[in-house]
From Swiss-Prot:
CDD domains, per the entry: CAP_PR-1 (cd05381)
Disulfide bonds: C68-C136, C109-C115, C131-C145
Family of this protein: Belongs to the CRISP family.
Record-linked PANTHER family: CYSTEINE-RICH SECRETORY PROTEIN-RELATED
Induction profile: Upon infection by virulent and avirulent races of pathogens, for example fungal pathogen C.fulvum.
Protein name, UniProt field: Pathogenesis-related leaf protein 4
Organism: Solanum lycopersicum (Tomato)
């Protein structure tokens, strides 16, 4: 009986550790840290967390859970989706990975590549951030981050 209890306890601890490691990548600080690191690299000030934006982002992520399609809501936002343990941190890193595809001198994406997620991350006038994450019906994760003030205005440089 004692061995069974120890096995059960170890199993519970492993499940909690896995859950914690997954959730540990989705806190407001996780979203902010990657945003603010990217912003600091180009001399842009840090963002702060906004609970109202986070609530809107979470509501929108929840509404997309049925199909997991990356359809914009019309708010100033970045969207991402991924399988497995796709985290908020991973989503922001994905957006920041577009940096080499942005040419500051021409204020354009290089070679027709996508770079608008990156420019929103570093948009100098966007100073508040709120993000949400929802599990889609297909098992993937849908992540939405909202920015205020809205950025990514055509023809304007992000910083």
């Amino acid at each position: 009986m004692g061995l069974f209890n120890i096995s059960l306890l170890l199993t519970c601890l492993m499940v909690l550790a896995i859950f914690h490691s997954c959730e540990a990548q989705n806190s407001p600080q996780d979203y902010l840290a990657v945003h603010n690191d990217a912003r600091a690299q180009v001399g842009v000030g840090p963002m702060s967390w906004d609970a109202n934006l986070a609530s809107r982002a979470q509501n929108y992520a929840n509404s997309r859970a049925g199909d997991c399609n990356l359809i914009h809501s019309g708010a100033g936002e970045n969207l991402a989706k991924g399988g497995g343990d796709f985290t908020g941190r991973a989503a922001v890193q994905l957006w920041v990975s577009e940096r080499p595809d942005y040419n500051y001198a021409t204020n354009q994406c290089v070679g027709g590549k996508m770079c608008g997620h990156y420019t929103q991350v570093v948009w100098r006038n966007s100073v508040r951030l709120g993000c949400g994450r929802a599990r889609c019906n297909n098992g993937w994760w849908f992540i939405s981050c909202n920015y205020d003030p809205v950025g990514n205005w055509v023809g304007e440089r992000p910083y």
